[in-house]
From Swiss-Prot:
Positions bearing N-acetylalanine: 2
Name of protein: General transcription factor 3C polypeptide 6
Predominant cellular place of this UniProt entry's protein: nucleus
Keywords from the named record: Acetylation, DNA-binding, Nucleus, Phosphoprotein, Transcription
Quaternary structure annotation from Swiss-Prot or TrEMBL: Part of the TFIIIC subcomplex TFIIIC2, consisting of six subunits, GTF3C1, GTF3C2, GTF3C3, GTF3C4, GTF3C5 and GTF3C6. Interacts with GTF3C4 and GTF3C5.
Location in or out of the cell: Nucleus
Organism field: Homo sapiens
Biological process terms in GO annotation: 5S class rRNA transcription by RNA polymerase III; transcription by RNA polymerase III; tRNA transcription by RNA polymerase III
GO cellular component terms, semicolon-separated: nuclear body; nucleoplasm; transcription factor TFIIIC complex
Function (record text): Involved in RNA polymerase III-mediated transcription. Integral, tightly associated component of the DNA-binding TFIIIC2 subcomplex that directly binds tRNA and virus-associated RNA promoters.
Residue positions, PTM Phosphoserine: 9
Alphabetized Pfam families for the sequence: TFIIIC_sub6
Length: 213
């Protein structure tokens, strides 16, 4: 751990001290073993002083959090020295620094955030087509929220309830139609036998109806 002093202008008359801390970064989710050697020791860090910083190395993005190590992490650097006149090289390890803080980073896939979309936590699902071993951008990331889970589970009982209500309504309507038909039959039966009207009366009745204005 090293401390560096950053002096302000003489007008302020105050000194501001910035504390520096060495952190061991562990990257997980890398497929290529030569990934770090190809990135030329360049990276971008976002939110390094937050609980969950984000690290970008080449085209890969990592997210993680700080942890305390079980022991002390000692870091050495390699120095290559010529051991003999035959040209055999000998690698010598030289102490560089040590730390007890670790930053565990995991490979993360980012999705575009739409305007007006709220930041709601959820489960990230990665869907890959069968027998598709192409590069990672073919993965589709979507978030499934707890409310959506409850809606999916509750949809089946709702459908069964709707079907039951429709059956009850149909039964009620059929019962009403039967009840309405029964009194009609009773009235016809109670009205007594039909009286045959002679043909002459039928004609007179017909003529009278024709003469009405």
């Amino acid at each position: 751990m090293a401390a560096a002093a950053d002096e302000r202008s003489p007008e302020d008359g105050e000194d501001e001290e910035e504390e520096e801390q060495l952190v061991l970064v562990e990257l997980s989710g890398i497929i290529d073993s030569d990934f770090l050697s190809k990135c030329e020791n360049k990276c971008k860090v976002l939110g390094i002083d937050t609980e969950r910083p984000i690290l970008q190395v080449d085209s890969c993005v990592f997210a993680g959090e700080y942890e305390d190590t079980l022991g002390t992490c000692v870091i050495f650097e390699e120095n290559v020295e010529h051991a003999d006149t035959e040209g055999n090289n000998k690698t010598v390890l030289k102490y560089k620094c040590h730390t007890m803080k670790k930053l565990s980073m995991t490979r993360t896939l980012l999705t575009e955030k739409k305007e007006g979309e709220e930041n709601i936590g959820g489960v990230e699902w990665l869907q890959i087509k069968d027998n598709d071993f192409s590069y990672r951008p073919n993965m589709i990331c979507n978030f499934l929220h707890e409310n959506e889970d409850e809606e999916v589970v509750a949809s089946a009982p709702d459908k069964s309830l709707e079907l039951e209500e429709e059956e009850i309504q149909m039964n009620d309507s059929s019962n009403l139609s039967c009840e309405q038909e029964k009194p009609m039959h009773l009235e016809i039966e109670d009205s007594g036998p039909l009286i045959d009207i002679p043909s002459e009366t039928e004609g007179s009745v017909f003529m009278e109806t024709q003469m009405l204005p």
